[in-house]
Each structure stands twice: as structure tokens, then as C-alpha cells.
């Protein structure tokens, strides 16, 4: 079994190769990174909303509230990042 490293766990080699600017514009890399980050945040929001929905259906309101609070915090981060 191989040792798990931070880089391997996060698949950093793949993640960091996903930014492929198409022009020589200085701001393009920033644009790509910000928008890719927002897509990842949106993916997490969807996950949290599904989790909250399941928890509410099960009557687990405190964990559902925590999931919805995470959604709110993620939205705040997204708003402040651009």
C-alpha cells in the first residue's frame, strides 16, 4: 500500500494542471482560478443542500441547520471573492 500524502489525497497534480490560459493576458489566470474555485464551491453547496434535505426528512434538524449554515458561509466567501 502506498503512503497517502497531502498532494496525492487532493490530486494536486491533476488539479494544478487544469488551468490553461488561452491568451497572454495577465489577468486570465486569475479569472480561471477564481471561476474554477467558484465551481468547486457550487459543487459543495449542492452537496450540503442534499445533505440538509435528507436530515430534515429524518427529523435531524440540528445537523440540517449546520449544513445550511455551511451553505451560507460558502455563499459569503463566494461573494467576497469577486
Model segments located where?
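Surface-exposed peri-terminal alpha-helical interaction modules
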Residues: 1-82
Amino acid at each position: 500500500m502506498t503512503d497517502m500524502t497531502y498532494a496525492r489525497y487532493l490530486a494536486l497534480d491533476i488539479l494544478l494542471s487544469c488551468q490553461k490560459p488561452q491568451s497572454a493576458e495577465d489577468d486570465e489566470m486569475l479569472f480561471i482560478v477564481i471561476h474554477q474555485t467558484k465551481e468547486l464551491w457550487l459543487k459543495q453547496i449542492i452537496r450540503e443542500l442534499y445533505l440538509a434535505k435528507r436530515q430534515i426528512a429524518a427529523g435531524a434538524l440540528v445537523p440540517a441547520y449546520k449544513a445550511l449554515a455551511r451553505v451560507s458561509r460558502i455563499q459569503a466567501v463566494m461573494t467576497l471573492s469577486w
